[in-house]
Amino acid sequence: FNTSIKIKKFIPYNKEEKFRTQFLSCIGQIEEEYCLYLNEDYLIYDKPDYKKLQEYVNVLEGNSCLSFIRLAKGMDAYDIPFSNTLQYLDCRNNYFFSQTASLWRTSHLLLIHKYGPDLHIAGKVMNEQFEVAASDVARSLGIQGLYHYDGESKRGTHHYDSKVFPYTASALVKGKWNLSEYGTELQKLKQEHGIDFSKRSHC
């Protein structure tokens, strides 16, 4: 796992378009076979386990039927082990496709957005959210995936911490700093980077 990768370029998108179209216009320009999927408020607060991340890339390389590996456990009701730290993600999961930090086979992530409905990330009702609608698309494409879990503690309502990739999921909730779930981590980042919490409210 290359820990010295530098940003090659920023790929802009049209702010007037919906999330799915924005994402599709960008991912089509990614040349690498695998990509690390993150949202902009997924802030890394500790050193990732690069050795384990490389191991997970090797898992994808050695198993062509797999499309992704989530780097943290979510609301996953089934325990189907693949290895000591990886579990199969049951396709019946309501959030089978999720915006959780994940390693993806780039071409498969592109297909989900290519055939998915043109929606935003968030919506007033569940079926207006791309994350929800894309789960049906992923199932129809035969997408299969795993998730990392190594006994980490639950954080908030929907996520667990991750030893392999320690990050905030999410640092912002509806535009507010998520101090209720990541108070310690965000205070540390505030001190290191001079973040002014007063410029936006917090929850």
Language-model segment annotations:
Residues F1-E31:
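Active-site-proximal specificity loops/subdomain of glycosyltransferases
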Residues C35:
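Short aromatic/hydrophobic "clamp" motif used to bind/position activated sugar donors
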Residues L38:
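Catalytic metal- and UDP-sugar-binding loop of GT-A-like glycosyltransferases, i.e.
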Residues Y42-I44:
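Acidic metal-phosphate-binding loop of nucleotide-sugar-dependent transferases
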Residues D46-M75:
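Conserved donor-nucleotide/metal-binding helix-loop-beta segment in metal-dependent transferases, i.e.
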Residues I80-N94, H108:
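Short, flexible, basic/aromatic active-site loop/helix in glycosyltransferases
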Residues N94-S180:
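Catalytic core and acceptor-binding pocket of nucleotide-sugar-dependent glycosyltransferases
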Residues Q187-C203:
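Terminal low-complexity segments of carbohydrate-biosynthetic enzymes
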